[in-house]
Amino acid sequence: MTFRLKAGQLAENERYIVLDAVKHFHRLKYWITAAVVMPDHVHLLLQPVVTESGVDFSLSKILQGIKGFSAREINRGRKAKGHVWQDESYDRIVRDYAEFLEKWNYIRHNPTKDELCEAPEDYAFLWEPGEAPE
């Protein structure tokens, strides 16, 4: 899943806000394999959780929560109002392990590709919890 900033770039403290929003419902509403918050966009490799009662969390609801919370906090810090994120987002169903590895590696190496760090593990806004969904 990818979503983009409406305009400009996120300051470092704003990227922490977004990453915290992503982490907040990990294991409760979705399982994150990898998340990266870039200056102007976010990539997530996640799987929605299905509860014991059969309730699953839709991608649109998951995204609404992440974007809504982070936008409110970013606007509060900027003393601004209005949209932080573009309305559009892009998602894709990962159909096999090869595609999973491709997406995971793309997310991991996005900061190095954009020359924000030398190695993926050096980028403060890359999160890979290292857990598998139950």
Placement of each model-derived feature along the sequence:
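Short catalytic/metal-binding and nucleic-acid-binding patches
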Residues: 1-134
